[in-house]
Regions:
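Catalytic beta-strand/loop module used to bind and position nucleotide/cofactor moieties
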Residues: 16-18, 32, 42, 51-53, ...
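A glycine-rich, hydrophobic loop/mini-helix early in the fold
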Residues: 273, 279, 292-334
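Compositionally biased, intrinsically disordered low-complexity segments enriched
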Residues: 116-124, 173-179, 197-206
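Short amphipathic alpha-helical segments
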Residues: 99, 103, 107, 150-154, ...
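Active-site loop/lid in soluble adenylation, ligation, and acyl-transfer enzymes
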Residues: 2-39, 43-68, 152-172, 176-177, ...
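Active-site- and interface-proximal helix/loop "cap" or "latch" segments in soluble metabolic
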Residues: 68-168, 435
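Short linear segments in intrinsically disordered or otherwise low-structure-confidence regions
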Residues: 191-197, 208-211
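Short, highly charged C-terminal tails/helix-capping segments
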Residues: 143-153, 367-376, 463
Length: 463
């Protein structure tokens, strides 16, 4: 049901509104299953519907070579007090599901505590070493590993969110963000749950990206891999499956199901080449859909928005332009390796296969695969605990750009300036280097060549 619009409250630029029916509801956005609720004031419209209303502001930060972190703060409209904080982004968090859930909830609560203490006391900058240690301790307590983001990144995003909603000006200079010009709150909008509200016209906000940092080394020199890694692949001997076409949500479900079957010892190690039945935007486990996807444009263009079980960024999927595969392996396969090494192990066969086809490719950052001209694809991982007497499993999936309508991608995805701030090439369109032009192969032909590499006598990734 569409509810009548509420009267707009006087507010600074770069804020958004959430309106929620009072009856048992809480302010909520799609945060990957981690909704946060805030108690705020209420409003009554002309039809006597009672609403809770809060004002939102968002800040972002991305350290060079790392992943984007976004923090959204919710403020009560009557007094401006911050009543909720929420972290989202492209980062990865490794740990069992319950521990990851607890970590995110504690992190959100800690940010709210930091803000409230800072506002009332104004004597300690919230990004001082003690505050950084406070956030780092939460990850240690919950036995999770946060990759490609750190406490300083989270706190900087928090300060930018506060600055965007006008809270920073009331603080002493010692507790303000060091670079106030780097405010990255963006795409302010008015939203209503359960029905969407019309956009609120907002004043323009100047977004000044952080200084450009050198792009991460792409490692285009042919990588070498330890002989012991080749032995792991020989022992793994994965089954190769070129799957039937599946719709987006079914793809997500199959990934989890097959991972759990391997974790239980009910399925052998498998590499599945996906076939997409329809276009999709696949967001990462910890991303905020409204801040990553222009949902109205996606719907108009026929894209289904789904969430995968792994971290990382959004994937733009058109069936004929995308090659996706998943590796489902027992956990021993990546035992005793750090996170970066496990990515290299799982993708060593792919690098060898693409180089065998004449592509100048290598690793970029933690989880990207790139040529000398741009990004070809990205990977993500998740570990599943043993089920019964099973070995546990590691899910490693990769999406490659066979071809791409990059202009359409920029219409559908909401790619912020902060996300591109450490890239030498600032245009998302120019950063993608599809394989179609490089190989001259059809999509099916390229998949067949990749599958052949996995079954060669010397094993995947053999030189």
């Amino acid at each position: 049901m569409n509810h009548p619009s509420l009267a707009l409250l006087d507010s600074p630029p770069a804020v958004a509104y959430i309106s929620v029916p009072l009856a048992g509801c809480r302010a909520k956005r799609d945060w990957g299953g981690f909704a946060y609720g805030v108690e705020t004031t209420t409003r009554t419209d002309s039809a006597c519907n009672v609403y809770r209303v809060n004002i939102e502001s968002r800040g972002e930060c991305k350290r060079p070579g790392g992943k984007l972190v976004g923090v959204t703060v919710a403020c009560a409209p009557d007094n401006g007090h911050v009543v909720g904080c929420r972290v989202d982004g492209d980062f990865f968090v490794e740990g069992d599901d319950a521990a990851v859930d607890r970590y995110l909830r504690r992190l959100n609560a800690a940010l709210l505590d930091i803000v409230q203490r800072d506002i009332t006391q104004c004597d300690t900058p919230p990004d001082d070493p003690d505050t950084v240690s406070y956030l780092e301790r939460i990850a240690r307590d919950e036995h999770v590993s946060v990759t490609s983001a750190n406490a300083e990144t989270i706190l900087t995003a928090l300060r930018r969110a506060l600055s965007a909603c006008g809270r920073d000006a009331a603080r002493p200079a010692s507790s303000r963000l060091a670079s106030p010009a780097s405010v990255t709150a963006h795409d302010a909008r008015r939203r209503a749950t359960p029905s969407a509200a019309s956009a609120v016209p907002t004043s323009s906000v100047t977004i000044t990206p952080a200084a450009s940092a050198p792009q991460a080394s792409r490692g285009l020199t042919p990588p070498t891999f330890p002989g012991e890694w080749h032995e792991r692949w020989h022992r793994l001997a994965p089954k190769i499956v070129v799957d039937k076409p599946r719709r987006p949500q079914e793809q997500m479900d199959v990934d989890v199901q097959w991972s759990r079957e391997v974790a239980a010892g009910e399925r052998p190690a498998t590499i599945r080449f996906w076939q997409w039945a329809s276009p999709a935007v696949v967001v990462g486990r910890f991303q905020s859909i409204p801040d990553e996807v222009h949902e109205d444009v996606a719907a108009k263009e026929g894209f289904t928005v789904v969430r995968r079980c792994t971290g990382g960024g959004a994937m733009f999927i058109e069936p004929g332009n995308t090659i996706t595969y998943s590796l489902y392996a027992p956990r021993w396969f990546a035992a005793d390796l750090d996170i970066e090494e496990s990515y290299r192990l799982c993708d060593m066969w792919l690098i060898a296969a693409l180089r065998g086809l004449g592509l100048d490719v290598g690793f970029s950052g933690l989880n990207d695969i790139a040529s000398s001209h741009g990004k070809i694809g990205g990977a993500a991982q998740r570990r599943f605990p043993p089920i019964g007497s099973g070995p546990g499993s590691i899910l490693h999936h990769v999406t490659l750009a066979y071809d791409i309508d990059a202009v359409k991608m920029t219409r559908v995805l909401n790619i912020s300036g902060e996300k591109m701030s450490d890239k030498a090439v600032k245009s998302a369109v120019k950063r993608v280097d599809p394989m179609r032009a490089q190989t001259g192969l059809s999509r099916d032909g390229l998949i067949a060549r990749l599958a052949d590499c996995l079954t060669q006598p010397d094993g995947p990734g053999a030189n």
